[in-house]
Amino acid sequence: MDRTETIVVGAGPAGLLAAREIARRGIEVRILEEHPVIGEPNHCAGLLSVEGLRRLGIDPSPGFVQHEITGGRIYSPSGASIEIAGSRTRAYAIDRAAFDRHLADAARGAGAEVETGRRIRGLLIRDGRVEGVRGRDAYAKVVVDAEGAAGSLAREAGLPPAAGLLAGVNVEVSGIDVEPHMVEVWLGDVLAPGLFAWVIPLGDGAARCGLACSSGDAFERLKRFLHRRFGSVRFSPPRRGLILTGGPIHRTYLDGLLVAGDAAGQTKPTTGGGVILGGICAIEAGRTAAEGVEADDPSAGFLKRYQRAWREALGREFASMLAARRLVNRLSDERIDRLFDAFRREGLEEKLRGLVDAGDMDMQSGVILAALRDPGLLGVLVRGAGRLALAELRALFNP
């Protein structure tokens, strides 16, 4: 019988960080990854904050950092823009495949076993308790499900699927004119319903461009955007993926099972980014899995400490970003254009820049709260979004 102390399903960042944490605590851990090469297929936009990497205990490495980002420019549907420029490096454009391999090396270095080309066909469940995985069956005291946005294992175990599923696509474009250290975010329901389009500079006139949407074909939408933004350009083959903006699932543990990362919906609802917040949660999952093995108690009653931990650390962040996402999703393109006009007309661009520059790319509740407390910004938001929508957002900070 194939048996180990813990199994992690999925060798993306969440799975690798969970495994690194388990191995550091001296507990056996085996990572099972369905694809033959870690980091492939790569369907991530590849933009990570400096502070986020620090939170995960990852030093920026030339092996995966492609370019430094200091700020961004946000565009309205009509093409008006607000610049959020900073004087320091705020984020890195990364090679996601190289980043994942970097994490895999760290997990192996801590003592984890990584097995690629291992397709999992389901969970081994007996008397309501997860005991391992099917497909060349393997048994473990605790299974960490970090399989990604599809979430099939969690659903098999009876947990709800993550909400806010969007189709995303990325391509790389060269020979274009872009600001070398400024990300572009393009809003609009006609362009990208449910999220936005993005341009991430990579240096030397190249950029990673992408789009995510809740309806229609994402690649067709992206091609129209590229033509609008750059004219006739050549681009790399598209890389498609799933993006989640609906917030975490309500329960992330069962007897013998922990769910982390995209599989648990632990992504930023505002942007769909999941590496940092999902990684923070995954480290908590690894810690709890190791403690469950040490205590010889993989019961739900013991493992629920994982959910308590990540909710205490990030619950307000997820809730505030989800409320902000729902508010933005209600806005028509015309309303967004009016908001941009009002920000410029009332001279609030500098104030908005200051809030965002002083804020945190991943822990966004501080920026949201500061905007709601500023009379000028609040007045514009009320006129643009409506009192009811903003009241729902403010209620998060006044329980």
Question: Where are the regions that the model predicts?
Answer:
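Beta1/beta-strand and adjacent pyrophosphate-binding region of the FAD-binding site
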Residues: 1-14
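Conserved hydrophobic helix-helix packing surfaces used for dimerization/oligomerization
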Residues: 6-8, 29, 257
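Predominantly flavin-linked oxidoreductase catalytic cores and closely associated redox partners
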Residues: 11, 25, 101, 106-236, ...
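Glycine-rich FAD pyrophosphate-binding loop
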Residues: 20-43
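Conserved N-terminal glycine-rich FAD pyrophosphate-binding loop of Rossmann-like flavoproteins
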Residues: 35-59
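A conserved beta-strand/loop capping segment in the N-terminal third of enzymes
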Residues: 50-102
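FAD/FMN-dependent oxidoreductases across multiple families
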Residues: 214-294, 300-301
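C-terminal helical "tail/cap" subdomain of flavin- and related membrane-associated enzymes
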Residues: 290-399
